[in-house]
Amino acid sequence: MIDLKFLRDNPDVVRTSQITRGEDPALVDELLSADEARRQAIQVADELRSEQKAFGKKIGQASPEDRPALLEGSNELKAKVKEAEAAQETAEQRVHDLQMKLSNVVEGAPAGGEDDFVVLEHVGEPRTFDFEPKDHLELGESLGLIDMKRGTKVSGARFYYLTGDGAMLQLGMLTLAAQKATAAGFTMMIPPVLVRPEIMAGTGFLGDHSEEIYYLERDDMYLVGTSEVALAGYHKDEIIDLNNGPVKYAGWSSCFRREAGSYGKDTRGILRVHQFDKVEMFVYCKPEEAEEQHRRLLEMEKDMLAAVEVPYRIIDVAGGDLGASAARKFDTEAWVPTQGTYRELTSTSNCTTFQGRRLQTRYRDENGKPQIAATLNGTLATTRWLVAILENNQQADGSVIVPEALRPFVGKDVLEPVK
């Protein structure tokens, strides 16, 4: 939710942002018009309440013979106040509804859609194989790491089991991420995976992509697609202390996505699935600190990717590919040899005050006045990483070398095919 004062003062900036996102700039003018109507409705209601108060004093001072006529006038005024307050409530709800439709203001992201990102950096060189590399599923099955057939039997398409060393590899990766997060000052959390509608809406996930979210109608609850949602809701309607710097959490949770718009895409293996595990970083900070915190989250992701030894690139995501809450987003994408392309492993987003305003998460400034906090998020490890780890570290004999940083968790240097 964007600041109405910012909208009034900078309507062209918000219109340009809408165009950059590929969204309707007319929504800006619709909201400005609704905001003006709301302000007029407030003024009318305030004036009538003031008149009603003055009229009440007049009745109290009136003589007995004048009071009946004045009481009749008071009843008429009371009806007008009630009508004006109803009009004010309607006008305020209209503004709120339009505010909830308007995406965050893009800050520095390139224009365009999904394919218009800008590559900021390449790290590591894609490996040249002197044998025909296997894809992650073939490797996962031959090494006894992934069981898609039984996952499908038990739960349907896009479900799987991680078995044996596959389970240990993921647990090791996520544990390493948790260790790195706590060493960097993040408080680890295992948050709920079911949240109320107001929390899901507060994070900006109930817009155009709400079909991606699992909804439990009987309980009126949503399954999270990222622990960002529960971590953002943690301080809803609170004033938090940011005097000693940003408040930082890292959530370890299972995540659930319907993949409603992905029919036929990535149907093989665990690249695009309905359930996966993830360690997600989440930061609350003062708005002026958000850009620096965004850079730090990206550095955390780079450090973790270096530990798992995969070549990757960093992209500046285009405005048309941003989620509603993000003002800017950087993705890291790892090289997947059998696909001959880079695939997303992490995202880190600067959501400025968009989520904080929706969830009413505030801090006190140097004058003690409550202000809206900024929020940021970033992936530190997730199930999908196994794809890049397996494919980039495979050997001609079908084995996979375990990245050195993960060996203490897996208990092996090399994963051998199951005989």
Curated annotation (Swiss-Prot):
Its main location: cytoplasm. GO terms for biological process: selenocysteine biosynthetic process; seryl-tRNA aminoacylation. L-serine binds at residues 226-228, 280, 379. InterPro entries: aa-tRNA-synt_IIb (IPR002314), aa-tRNA-synth_II (IPR006195), aa-tRNA-synth_II/BPL/LPL (IPR045864), Ser-tRNA-ligase_type_1 (IPR002317), Ser-tRNA-synth_1_N (IPR015866), SerRS_1_N_sf (IPR042103), SerRS_core (IPR033729), tRNA-bd_arm (IPR010978). Pfam families: Seryl_tRNA_N, tRNA-synt_2b. Keywords: Aminoacyl-tRNA synthetase, ATP-binding, Cytoplasm, Ligase, Nucleotide-binding, Protein biosynthesis. Pathway: Aminoacyl-tRNA biosynthesis; selenocysteinyl-tRNA(Sec) biosynthesis; L-seryl-tRNA(Sec) from L-serine and tRNA(Sec): step 1/1. GO terms for cellular component: cytoplasm. One of its GO terms (molecular function) is ATP binding. Its EC number is 6.1.1.11. ATP binds at residues 257-259, 273, 344-347. It is found in: Cytoplasm. The keyword Aminoacyl-tRNA synthetase applies. Gene3D superfamilies: Bira Bifunctional Protein, Domain 2, Serine-tRNA synthetase, tRNA binding domain. It comes from the Bacteria. It catalyses: tRNA(Ser) + L-serine + ATP = L-seryl-tRNA(Ser) + AMP + diphosphate + H(+); tRNA(Sec) + L-serine + ATP = L-seryl-tRNA(Sec) + AMP + diphosphate + H(+). Signal peptide: none annotated. Homodimer. The tRNA molecule binds across the dimer. Belongs to the class-II aminoacyl-tRNA synthetase family. Type-1 seryl-tRNA synthetase subfamily. NCBIfam families: serS. Catalyzes the attachment of serine to tRNA(Ser). Is also able to aminoacylate tRNA(Sec) with serine, to form the misacylated tRNA L-seryl-tRNA(Sec), which will be further converted into selenocysteinyl-tRNA(Sec). Consists of two distinct domains, a catalytic core and a N-terminal extension that is involved in tRNA binding. This is Serine--tRNA ligase. It comes from Corynebacterium efficiens (strain DSM 44549 / YS-314 / AJ 12310 / JCM 11189 / NBRC 100395).
